[in-house]
Structures are given as structure tokens and as C-alpha cells.
Regions:
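Sec/Tat signal peptide C-region and signal peptidase I cleavage site
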Residues: 17-21
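Positively charged n-region of N-terminal signal peptides that target proteins for export
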Residues: 1-4
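Sequence context surrounding c-type heme c attachment/ligation sites in exported
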Residues: 24-147
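Bacterial N-terminal signal peptides
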Residues: 7-16
């Protein structure tokens, strides 16, 4: 039994350690309180994206636009504490974060503009704008990690 446990642990470490060592994302160090605040913001961003998708799935694009602007758009920055967080971020990370907030505001505009287009074209506009938001999230998580 001990041999099997040891063998399983050895295989796990053999597989896991290289994966951890290959993490080439830039480490961003900040005080624990700020890191926790940033992580909470990112979790809220994910909840917001989920809410936007739920509203779109219900056919309530106007609510999705309002949610995007009020919780992720440029008008939401004060609520996120962006002013005191930005100086702690490397410039590239800060730029990606700003692009997320701009993309959310553009999404809200795209939803309203889509109402003036044929349904299929309007849907493509909305999904393209939504993808800009998720692309910003993916770019940041692919390039940076917090400590």
C-alpha cells in the first residue's frame, strides 16, 4: 500500500512540477491587501460576464448592456478602486485592464446599435463586442500572475 502511494505521489510530482516551472507569466507582487482586492475584483468581473451572458440568453440585451456599463465599463472604475490599484500594475497589465473597461463600454454601445441592424448582423455585433471583453481577460491571465 505504501509503495503504491509513493509511486502515485512520484508520478504526480513528475507531471506537476514541470507544469509549474513552465509558468512564464510575469509575476506581479503587491501587498496582500491589494492583491486580495484585485482578486475579488476579478472574481466580480467573471460574475458580471456570467450575468451578461444570462441576460443575453433571456433575450434581455438592454439589461446586458446596462450590466456591462455599470459593473465593467468606464463608468464603473471608481467602484473598483482602479485609481489606487493601477500604480501597482506593470504598464502592460494596466493597459489590458483599461482595454477591458473600454471594451465593456463599447459592448453597451454595440447592443444599442445592434437594434438598428438586421437580427443576424446585430447578433454578430454583440458577440464581437462581448469577445473583446473576454479577450482582455484572457490576455491578462495569460501574461500575468499575482503574488
Amino acid at each position: 500500500m505504501i509503495r503504491k502511494t509513493f509511486a502515485a505521489l512520484a508520478v504526480f510530482l513528475w507531471l506537476a512540477v514541470p507544469a509549474m516551472a513552465d509558468d512564464s507569466r510575469q509575476m506581479v507582487e503587491m501587498p496582500a491587501m491589494m492583491r486580495d482586492h484585485m482578486l475579488a475584483n476579478m472574481r466580480d468581473h467573471l460574475r458580471t460576464l456570467d450575468q451578461i451572458l444570462a441576460e443575453l440568453a433571456k433575450g434581455d440585451a438592454k439589461s446586458a448592456a446596462d450590466t456591462a456599463e455599470s459593473r465593467l465599463g468606464m463608468s464603473s472604475l471608481d467602484a473598483h478602486g482602479a485609481e489606487h490599484m493601477a500604480p501597482m500594475m506593470p504598464p502592460g497589465m494596466r493597459d489590458i485592464g483599461t482595454s477591458l473597461h473600454h471594451a465593456a463600454s463599447r459592448f453597451a454601445i454595440a447592443v444599442h446599435d445592434a437594434e438598428l441592424e438586421p437580427p443576424e448582423q446585430g447578433a454578430r455585433m454583440v458577440f464581437a463586442a462581448l469577445r473583446e471583453m473576454t479577450a482582455a481577460c484572457e490576455a491578462c491571465h495569460a501574461g500575468y500572475r499575482l503574488r
